Amino acid sequence: MELKVDTHTHTYASGHAYSTLIENAKSAKENGLDMFCTTDHAESMPGAPHYWFFSNQKILPRFLEGVAIIRGVESNIMNTQGDIDIPESVDRNLDWVIASFHEPVFRPADSATHTEALLNIIKNGRVDALGHLGNPNFDFDFEVVLKCAKEHYVAIEINNTTLKGNSRVGSVDRCHQIAQIGKDLGVFFTTGSDAHFCHDVGNLSLVSELMDRVGIDSSKVITHSAQQFLAFLELRGRKPIAEYDEIRNA
């Protein structure tokens, strides 16, 4: 499947990544992307920036190297109440919010606890996508959570770094299960490289292979085109980004 948007990338600001936004944009162009989301870790992760970093993304250009830039964050799931570690005052300056479990922030518990947290994250209305759900340390009820995500128009990320098999070990088979259940339920999928170095921005080959193998229709993959991604943001109630009118109307 052709994928023209990468919705999960990091810069050196995350504390354990190694490239600048400009370097990421250059790689995005070289790798054939039309658009990518810059989504550094929110502040509860060790080494991550203060929330001002995300609020100030309003100064970023809408295009770098001819590639559209979406202003985002990978927030942390903080508790079972559905809280993330970004103040609500920052929301107006962001286009895209991922929420993910990370072991340094949320101590792994049992499936019921993780399921409750994910359901409340979905229902809080602030989160556009759930990140790298395959992690076996954070088991959850796939069908219940994915059904809720469908009902609330929250995208399910398939993460290319996870599919390499050396990060969040034990996730690969679970990602296939999530993709199959998501396909059957009709969820929206998004695709992220989870790049921590610029050369990986736009590297979505394993995700593409998985989606083809499972038989997911491109109409349910919001990153199949930049137009589909922007349409999904509007479906979620986000204000259209004027600088992308030409993309939207292409």
Swiss-Prot record:
Entry GO CC: cytosol
InterPro entries to which the protein is assigned, alphabetical: Phosphatase_YcdX_put, PHP_dom, PHP_phosphatase, Pol/His_phosphatase_N, Pol/histidinol_Pase-like
Keyword vocabulary terms for this entry: Hydrolase, Metal-binding, Zinc
GO molecular function: phosphatase activity; zinc ion binding
Amino acids binding Zn(2+) 2: H16, H41, H196
EC number: 3.1.3.-
Hydrolase in keyword set: yes
Xref: CDD domains: PHP_HisPPase_Ycdx_like
Cofactor binding remark: Binds 3 Zn(2+) ions per subunit.
Domain of life: Bacteria
Protein name, as recorded: Probable phosphatase VIBHAR_04983
Native species: Vibrio campbellii (strain ATCC BAA-1116)
